[in-house]
């Protein structure tokens, strides 16, 4: 590996590569979330029978992981490059390894290991069979075959590839701190994100208004339930994302006891499951329009009616 790609160049190369494999290039979803999986472009589109191939960068906020910009590898906000392919291609692992070649990483010259790490997101009712991908001893990617999303069985099989962009870039650029990464020519990662890391950490751990957050969680939950009842799936899901982020802020602040924590997660999970069912019902009502094979589409609609 000779070329030390900037983080911007890494993103562009991944976009070009996965676009060539048939993925639509989506944009980051504009509501706070803890992982790219929580974007509606993955969470909602992974369920139901319609095909879906997409790739996008997703800034992911995890308040409890903030370290005031002082830790070289732990961040309040990191960036994921998310790929979802449904149905999963038989050669998805080969496609992934070829994507590393596009970044100048020859799998034959490096120690690349798929380490079993089955994935679960209890708060969203999600689980799958998966692996961490380790490159010369550093985890750079999470690879998952979804089994359950929003409490619903995933069929057809859907694969998710999630690159940790900061880790991947740290390896490619051979730096020990994410803040030393080159984002673009002459601009360091720290020039953009170090101060926000400090400020968000200070807010999350010291300054957030707990009473306000507790009130907001209840209000967001009420609004989500109301819009589920109204059949407005996407606005309802936005409020579930808001509940999730609000809970993460409360958790980082130490405002939630162990017993209360389980209760909050259960409340989020129940809403996510309701939305998953409502989304599939909405797509069925529209006739599963992304299924282009008419015979298959009619069979899928008949199967849904028989359930």
Swiss-Prot record:
It comes from Levilactobacillus brevis (strain ATCC 367 / BCRC 12310 / CIP 105137 / JCM 1170 / LMG 11437 / NCIMB 947 / NCTC 947) (Lactobacillus brevis). The keyword Ubl conjugation does not apply. It holds the Pfam family tRNA-synt_2e. GO terms for biological process: glycyl-tRNA aminoacylation. One of its GO terms (cellular component) is cytosol. It comes from the Bacteria. CDD domains: GlyRS_alpha_core. The lineage of its organism: Bacteria, Bacillati, Bacillota, Bacilli, Lactobacillales. Belongs to the class-II aminoacyl-tRNA synthetase family. Its main location: cytoplasm. Gene3D superfamilies: Bira Bifunctional Protein, Domain 2 (3.30.930.10), Class II aaRS and biotin synthetases, domain 2 (1.20.58.180). InterPro entries: aa-tRNA-synth_II/BPL/LPL (IPR045864), Gly-tRNA-synth_heterodimer (IPR006194), Gly-tRNA_ligase_asu (IPR002310). This is Glycine--tRNA ligase alpha subunit. Its EC number is 6.1.1.14. It catalyses: tRNA(Gly) + glycine + ATP = glycyl-tRNA(Gly) + AMP + diphosphate. It is found in: Cytoplasm. Keywords: Aminoacyl-tRNA synthetase, ATP-binding, Cytoplasm, Ligase, Nucleotide-binding, Protein biosynthesis. GO terms for molecular function: ATP binding; catalytic activity, acting on a protein; glycine-tRNA ligase activity; transferase activity. Tetramer of two alpha and two beta subunits.
């Amino acid at each position: 590996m000779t070329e030390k790609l900037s983080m911007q160049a890494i993103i562009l190369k991944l976009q070009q590569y996965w676009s060539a494999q048939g993925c639509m290039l989506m944009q980051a979803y504009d509501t706070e979330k803890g992982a790219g999986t929580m974007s509606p472009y993955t969470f909602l589109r992974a369920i139901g029978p319609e095909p879906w191939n997409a790739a996008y960068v997703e800034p992911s906020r995890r308040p409890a992981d903030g370290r005031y910009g002082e830790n070289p590898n732990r961040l309040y906000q990191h960036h994921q490059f998310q790929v979802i392919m449904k149905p999963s291609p038989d050669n998805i692992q080969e496609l992934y390894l070829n994507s590393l070649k596009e970044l100048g990483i020859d799998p034959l010259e490096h120690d690349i290991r798929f380490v079993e790490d089955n994935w679960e997101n209890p708060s969203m009712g999600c689980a799958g069979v998966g692996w961490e991908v380790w490159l010369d001893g550093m985890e750079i990617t999470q690879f998952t075959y979804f089994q359950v999303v929003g409490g619903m069985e995933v069929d057809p099989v859907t694969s998710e590839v999630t690159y940790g962009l900061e880790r991947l870039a740290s390896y490619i650029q051979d730096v020990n701190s994410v803040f030393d990464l080159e984002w673009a020519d002459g601009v360091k990662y720290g020039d953009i994100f170090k101060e926000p890391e400090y400020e968000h950490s200070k807010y999350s751990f010291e300054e957030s208004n707990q009473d306000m957050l507790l009130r907001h969680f209840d209000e967001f939950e009420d609004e989500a339930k109301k819009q589920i009842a109204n059949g407005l799936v996407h606005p309802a899901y936005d409020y579930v994302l808001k509940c999730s982020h609000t809970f993460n802020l409360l958790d980082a602040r130490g405002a939630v006891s162990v017993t209360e924590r389980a209760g909050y997660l259960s409340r989020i999970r129940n809403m996510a499951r309701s939305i998953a069912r409502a989304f599939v019902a909405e797509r069925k009502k529209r006739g599963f329009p992304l299924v282009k094979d008419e015979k298959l589409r009619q069979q899928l609609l008949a199967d849904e009616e028989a359930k």
